[in-house]
């Protein structure tokens, strides 16, 4: 789970995140999605938006797995440059430059039916404004 990286390297704005391929002997951790390996191939550095797109894709591919400590339920305010929110009616707000990542669940279960991501740019997406996963302005609820 990419979001587990933020548990260990939580200073998002001053950290770098990479897409890697674990190789050799692999060992999974029973606590979260950590693994250890004897070889690690670094494929490329991820831009901030790419990191959260990978996190959203992981949630969609593994809807029953824990989301990680940085994912909020239903509503979130960005902190440290981002907000990741999951729920039936996810909504979030942030400051200029913040990334908002949304995972909307199906009404009848945890399956993810819609993923979306935006950057608060001050033009199309405004600071301190609540948005739903379709980037429509909404109430905090």
Give each language-model segment a name.
Residues 2-141:
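Short, glycine-biased loop/turn motifs at secondary-structure junctions and
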């Amino acid at each position: 789970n990419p979001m587990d990286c933020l548990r260990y390297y939580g200073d998002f704005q001053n950290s770098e995140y990479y897409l890697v391929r674990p190789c050799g002997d692999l060992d999974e951790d029973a606590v979260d999605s950590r693994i250890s390996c004897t070889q690690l191939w670094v494929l490329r550095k991820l831009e901030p938006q790419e990191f959260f797109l990978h996190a959203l894709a992981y949630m969609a591919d593994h809807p029953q797995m824990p989301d990680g400590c940085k994912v909020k339920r239903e509503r979130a305010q960005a902190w440290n440059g981002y907000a990741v929110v999951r729920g039936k009616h996810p909504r979030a707000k942030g400051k200029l430059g913040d990334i908002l990542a949304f995972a909307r669940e199906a009404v009848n279960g945890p399956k993810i039916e819609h993923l979306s991501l935006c950057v608060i740019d001050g033009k199309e997406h405004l600071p301190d404004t609540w948005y739903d996963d379709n980037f429509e302005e909404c109430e905090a609820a």
